[in-house]
Amino acid sequence: MPINVYPYDFREFLDVCQVPYDKLSLISTEGKARMMNRLNDYFHHGGFPEGVLMKAKRDYLLSVYQKIYLNDIVARNSITNIFGLKVMIKKIAESIKQPISFSRIANIVSTTGTKLSTTSAVKYMEYMESSWLITKVTNMAAKLADKESNAKYYFTDNGILDLFLIDADTSLLENLVASDLIHRYGRDDAVFFYNKGIEVDFYVPEEELAIQVSYSIKDEDTRKREVKALQAIEKVLPCKRCLMITYDEEDAWQLSSEGIEVIPLWKWLLR
């Protein structure tokens, strides 16, 4: 049986950084600040073991991406259209949070001047998944063919994703929640999104857990939209728990039969 190896989770990351995260430590202003400082580091630079204590983290992550991921995918699968592969990876990074079809990604790459067929896009996506660069989350409400051809893709580590994005904290937040869920529950039909009249970021059947991800819900329109989606999903799927995960906001509302919890990212990761 293959062993799935993931980057450090947040607890392991804090252990290596020697930052305590017990309840007593987090009650103090200083203790909470130390933990939040490390969270920002983990959020942007990920959890690859060798890079945790490095100062030149971006250089290290570029090296990991180019020498391990990119070179491995190219060499192991005898890819000749390297530029097309690079463009495809960048476009997947820019499409975090959105379902993306094989034909659409092939068309996007082809507009850059390097032709990429839909068949090649399918193969490249499979290569990226098998190398653990990305993981797939499918639409629970979709038919089988659409599940495979119109999925969402997330990067296994936030540090690699951050190489491709500028000022994109919302994408990094959703990616980190996705990678944490997949780490906890597995890759194979354990974590889904739901999109059929209702858009819900994640649903975990094993836990009957529905999750919306929003960097902040201080804006009233944003809050109403996220609440509406969670209230609606309860009428379609069994939901023992409905969560909104934010970067650093917390609340609880009894707006549905089970209530809706607003939980900050750090508390979710340390659960």
Give, region by region, the residue ranges found by the protein language model.
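A short helix-turn-beta junction within AAA+ P-loop NTPase domains corresponding to the substrate/partner-engaging
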Residues: M1-R11
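Conserved AAA+ ATPase "sensor/coupling" helix adjacent to the nucleotide-binding pocket
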Residues: V16-S25, K67-I68
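Amphipathic alpha-helical "lid/sensor" segments that cap RecA-like P-loop NTPase cores
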Residues: S25-Y65
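Accessory nucleic acid-recognition modules appended to NTPase machines
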Residues: V52-A210, Y215
